[in-house]
């Protein structure tokens, strides 16, 4: 869900997008359940990559690790691959990220970003190598790093109280996201429900429409930024995890400037602790 950053190749943006949208949750607390998922990534209906996630989650904490790589037709563009790791807590029905790290590697460049947060405020960011700054980039302010979640925390959808997990409460929200370089909102709106079947899960998912709203750190005149800000063809399907009262992405569909990218689970399972 990133706008184009300077110096980032298409293949690296594809990996970053895949990892950011895969953001599935887990945690290292007592009585943790183990969550595993495998995703296929397609562009224009053609397979271009795969992604795997594994982690643990509970009512009050999460940890996730995911990796993605281009394959099949995707290797005709690049041999890009990436990995992401994140930790945090769920407090009073709200996600409170603690750490976020992502590495994206292409044929000529590997970039690593690490970020720490406390109380939904960014306490540190390290990007190596750093992005080249551009004069047309909207400057980041201190307030752009407060009251935010990282791209992984953005897709850990917690539902407080007794609201049904698969219903409007899953979607009707605005999520403030800081990815270490840009600040944007994700505005979710409830569309309805669907029934899905994959290895490990068969049941309902909440369908949410998503709008990307750039706030700071982006380059407003870039075609990719304008396209995403006007994009009305972004959708996420969220599967429930009743024990933790969270929902996780089952399927993500994003129209891009070169066609629609779909990330969909072929395996999605929760193993309860014993």
Per-range role (PLM):
Residues 107-151:
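Internal, conserved structured core segments that host functional sites
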Residues 31-119, 164-274:
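Acidic, serine/threonine-rich low-complexity disordered tracts
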Residues 18-20, 30:
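Cleavable N-terminal signal peptides
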Residues 1-2, 274:
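Short, intrinsically disordered, low-complexity terminal/loop segments
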Residues 25-27:
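N-terminal signal peptide c-region/cleavage motif recognized by signal peptidases
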Residues 2-18:
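Bacterial N-terminal signal peptides that target proteins for export
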Residues 155-161:
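Long, charge-rich C-terminal accessory regions
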């Amino acid at each position: 869900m990133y706008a184009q950053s300077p110096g980032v190749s298409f293949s690296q943006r594809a990996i970053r997008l895949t990892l950011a949208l895969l953001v599935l949750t887990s945690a290292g607390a007592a009585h943790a359940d183990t969550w595993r998922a495998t995703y296929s990534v397609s562009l224009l209906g053609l397979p271009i990559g795969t992604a795997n996630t594994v982690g643990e989650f509970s009512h009050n904490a999460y940890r996730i690790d995911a990796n993605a790589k281009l394959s099949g037709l995707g290797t005709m563009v690049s041999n890009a691959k990436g990995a992401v790791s994140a930790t945090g807590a769920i407090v009073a029905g709200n996600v409170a990220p603690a750490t976020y790290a992502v590495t994206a590697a292409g044929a000529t460049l590997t970039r690593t970003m690490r970020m720490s947060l406390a109380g939904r405020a960014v306490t540190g960011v390290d990007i190596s190598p750093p992005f080249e700054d551009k004069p047309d980039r909207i400057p980041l302010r201190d307030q752009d790093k407060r009251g935010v979640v990282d791209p992984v925390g953005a897709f850990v959808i917690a539902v407080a109280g007794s609201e049904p997990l698969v219903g409007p409460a899953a979607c009707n929200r605005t999520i403030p996201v800081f990815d270490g370089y840009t600040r944007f909102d994700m505005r979710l709106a409830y569309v309805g429900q669907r029934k899905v079947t994959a290895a490990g899960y068969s049941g309902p998912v909440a369908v949410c429409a998503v709008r990307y709203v750039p706030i700071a750190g982006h380059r407003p005149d870039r075609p990719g930024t304008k396209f995403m800000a006007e994009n009305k063809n972004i959708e996420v399907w969220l599967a429930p995890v009743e024990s933790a009262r969270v929902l996780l992405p089952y399927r993500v569909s994003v129209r891009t400037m070169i066609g629609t990218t779909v990330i969909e689970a072929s395996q999605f399972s929760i193993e309860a602790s014993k």
